């Protein structure tokens, strides 16, 4: 039986595939957030985004550097014909991601309560606990994404991102809707709503919002499960197209322990650099919520007069989360352009790593210039237009 041949994507083709997937994901995100905001309210969005702001930096530390490291090492090994190394890199990467995923998940569980206390927002905990397992599934998913990126095949990453976003949309809206319906039915029957005794509809909604946000967070977790299932099935069905002949003719591979050390050595600086932006968002989240708490404590009447229409039907205890949710809504489109330009960097890694491995300086130069040129073509008009 004839062995399969590989079809590697060029730098720009790979960037195009990832960019299109990013646009689709962003469109799905808009479709998701508009009905979600209408469903769980601005107060619920405040809880959801507060939980998400803790999730992102831990997620970044857990897996930001590892996919890049795997992509880099796989592409170098492929360029130099070390096909046995490629197989070992995948196995080592999966073990590393499994360990890091477990540690990241435990870290988020441990940090959840201190974070809620520092933000003076204990009701955010249900959403935090529900979104926490997403770190584990994201880590497992990223082991496949980094591997296929290193093979210069961006399609699995792109398609899994669309599956993940679609799962987030469907499960997030369904779970949030179910929680709201359940809580409201309890109120109509005169029962407690999530452990709270309520006197009217406004108090019932106040009790429902934290758990409705947790329902939305369940969409994030289940979306990562959907993306992971797709990648597992894809790998079992199609594999990586490295042939038996290539494996037989490949040189003796590096030891797994050496490969693991190289992955970690490469991943740490990348993860730390990625962490800076996420930590800034976390600090912003804690600082803004604390300042809102302080402002509301002494100026509640002024704020209610200032936003009389918007705060109608909002309990005093929920004003802070309403204002924070309003702030979060304004940021929904902020990361669109950085997300698009980031795909260029991701698609460039295997091309640059392979060129570096074979000392092809001309290809390195052309690849870097191509990335910078396309980035400028995208970023400059958008910067001027948004400015």
Regions found by a protein language model. Give the residues of each.
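Interfacial/gating helices of multi-pass transporter permease domains
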Residues: 37-57, 209, 258-266, 289-334
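Alpha-helical transmembrane segments of multi-pass membrane proteins
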Residues: 110, 118-144
